[in-house]
């Protein structure tokens, strides 16, 4: 029996989502709080887990071609990780990360 892990999809994080992650790290002060670092690490792990189950999370109500992870605890700390699945290429592209309390996004916000 092989212990190799099969990865079905490659997860790519867009430049926009990388900036979102960096800003979020600063916003929650993860450099100075162990709890914030654990929360942030959990968010990043949820993104990595998309390589195995990209269709687990629901489609967004803004655009049916997009999906989102809802990460955190309600009501104050839920973040949305907006992504799309490029099925033919077996790629999950993370496009944007935003606080769940923010207004709906426009697809033009994802650039």
Language-model features, listed with the residues they occupy:
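Enriched for short, Lys/Arg-rich terminal
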Residues: 2-4, 71-111
């Amino acid at each position: 029996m092989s212990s190799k892990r099969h990865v079905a999809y490659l997860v790519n994080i867009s430049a926009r989502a990388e900036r979102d992650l960096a800003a979020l790290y600063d916003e929650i002060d993860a450099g100075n709080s162990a709890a914030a670092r654990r929360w942030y690490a959990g968010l990043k792990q949820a993104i990595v887990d998309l390589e195995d189950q990209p269709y687990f999370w629901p489609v967004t109500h803004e655009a049916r071609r997009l999906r989102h992870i809802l990460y955190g605890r309600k009501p104050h700390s839920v973040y949305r990780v907006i992504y799309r699945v490029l099925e033919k290429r077996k790629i999950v592209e993370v496009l944007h990360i935003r606080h769940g309390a923010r207004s709906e996004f426009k697809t033009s916000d994802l650039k």
